[in-house]
Every structure is written in C-alpha cells, then in structure tokens.
Swiss-Prot record:
This is Secreted effector CFEM9. Appears to function during host infection, and may play a role in suppressing the host immune response. It holds the Pfam family CFEM. Belongs to the RBT5 family. It is found in: Cell membrane; Secreted; Host nucleus; Host cell membrane. The CFEM domain is involved in heme-binding and contains 8 cysteines and is found in proteins from several pathogenic fungi, including both human and plant pathogens. The CFEM domain adopts a novel helical-basket fold that consists of six alpha-helices, and is uniquely stabilized by four disulfide bonds formed by its 8 signature cysteines. Residues 19-125 form the CFEM domain. It is a lipid-anchor; GPI-anchor. GO terms for biological process: biological process involved in interaction with host. A lipid is attached at residue 215 (GPI-anchor amidated glycine). Residues 216-239 form a propeptide. It comes from Marssonina brunnea f. sp. multigermtubi (strain MB_m1) (Marssonina leaf spot fungus). Residues 187-216 are annotated as: Disordered. Induction: Induced during infection of poplar leaves, with highest expression observed four days post inoculation.
Length: 239
C-alpha cells in the first residue's frame, strides 16, 4: 500500500510540473540545459530579441556582447519594460547571455540611461514637480491667468451706459468746407477774439448812453404811477 501511495504521489507531481511548464502561458519562460533550469520573464526575452534589429550583429552572440550600444539599449528596455518583481530575473538573463564569451561587459547594476532626450525629460519632469508642488505662486498657471485679467478692462470701460469710444462722442462732427483754407481751430480762435473785442469797443466809444440810467428814468416812472393812481381814484369817486 505504501508503494502504491508513493507512485500515485509522484505521478501527480509530474503532471503538475508538466502543466506549469508547457500548458500555461505566463510571464515566465523555462530556459535551461541538461543540468540547470531557470525561469525568465517575457520582458527579458522581448528586450533581448527585439533590440537585435537596431544592430548589424543579427544572431552573432559574440558581436552582440561586444556592441556597447546594443547592451545599453537592452538595459534601457529592461529598465522601462520590466516591473520590480521581474527586474532581477531579466537582468540575470541579460548577463547570462554573454557569460560564455570573451566580452563580458554586463554588470549587475544597470547604468543610468545616457540619452540626452531621456535625461532632459527627467530634468523637466523634476523641475515641473517642484514648481507645481510648491504652489501656484509662479510658473505656467500664473502666467496664463494674466490673459483674463487684461481682457476684463474692455467691459469695465463701458460700465454705466452705452459704449462711448471717446469723451467727445456726443459733439457733432465739424463741417469742413471745400473753399476753406484755415482749420476749424483757427476759425474758432478768430471768432473768440472778435467777441472779446466788443466789450472795450463799447466802453471806449463816446456815447450818451450812460445818461439814460440817471434820474430821468425814475421821473418817468413816477409820472406814470401818479397818472394811474389818479385814474383809479376818479373811477372810484364816480362809482
């Protein structure tokens, strides 16, 4: 009975290993030789295979391991495509590809991406995070908010009545004759001077007009008043 239980247990274990290794498609692949068996994530295989198209080495393992640009591209792909759980396994797979060659230039720590575009993008992102993290006292939001403030001046000018382009909008447009040579300003100045000259002309000319405002005017008024009083008294006596 013990032998039968042991055989059945081994059969179940073999079925489980076979199903996990071949039937179930996952993010891990089984790679190994006659004595060792290792699991590697799909991102490691994808980065190693797809990056070959950017080089001239094709399938030459010796050429791939000696190409520094290819190795940097593989590391950048692993750094961006593999998550934290699979990053160590993907890095181990990349290092293991060149263990049998004379050009073992892979290291345990991946280098920082040396491309200017990636470094510039990281710097801009860090600067933007600091800018917007410290508040909106300066930077792009404050600069863009200036446009509504400037445009608010236009409705303010027309508050309190209809739109008026200038303070002198109610004054009619001056008439310019075709035969006129001088400007309207010169004409108005000439008219004003003639008006001002009438006062001294009337005061300096010899005229008996000041005598009209003497006692003669009061005498005539008194005579008229006396006549009216006598007429009223006569009518009253008759009645």
């Amino acid at each position: 009975m013990r032998v039968l239980k042991f055989l059945s247990l081994m059969a179940m274990l073999g079925c489980t290993i076979g199903q996990s290794g071949s039937a179930t498609p996952g993010s891990l692949h089984l790679l190994g030789g006659p004595t060792t068996t290792d699991w590697y994530p799909e991102c490691a295989l994808r980065c190693w295979e797809n990056t070959k198209y950017v080089t001239k080495c094709s399938e030459d393992q010796q050429c791939l391991c000696s190409d520094v640009n290819y190795q940097n591209s593989v590391f950048q792909c692993i750094y961006s495509q593999c998550d934290t759980v699979h990053f160590g396994s993907a890095l181990h797979h990349a290092i293991a590809q060149c263990l049998g060659t004379d050009n073992e230039v892979f290291f345990a720590i991946p280098p920082i991406p040396d491309r200017d575009a990636l470094r510039r993008r990281e710097d801009e992102y860090a600067a933007g995070a600091k800018l917007f993290g410290s508040g909106s006292a300066a930077g792009y939001p404050t600069e863009s908010a200036a446009f509504p403030v400037q445009s608010a001046n236009y409705p303010t000018d027309s508050v309190g009545g209809p739109y008026s382009p200038s303070p002198t909008a109610s004054v009619p447009f001056p008439y310019f004759s075709l035969t006129s040579v001088t400007s309207p300003a010169a004409k108005s100045a000439t008219t004003t001077e003639a008006t001002r000259n009438t006062v001294p002309a009337s005061t300096t000319a010899p005229s008996p007009s000041p005598q009209l405002y003497t006692g003669n005017a009061s005498t005539s008024r008194a005579t008229v008043s006396l006549t009216v009083v006598l007429t009223v008294a006569a009518v009253y006596l008759v009645l």
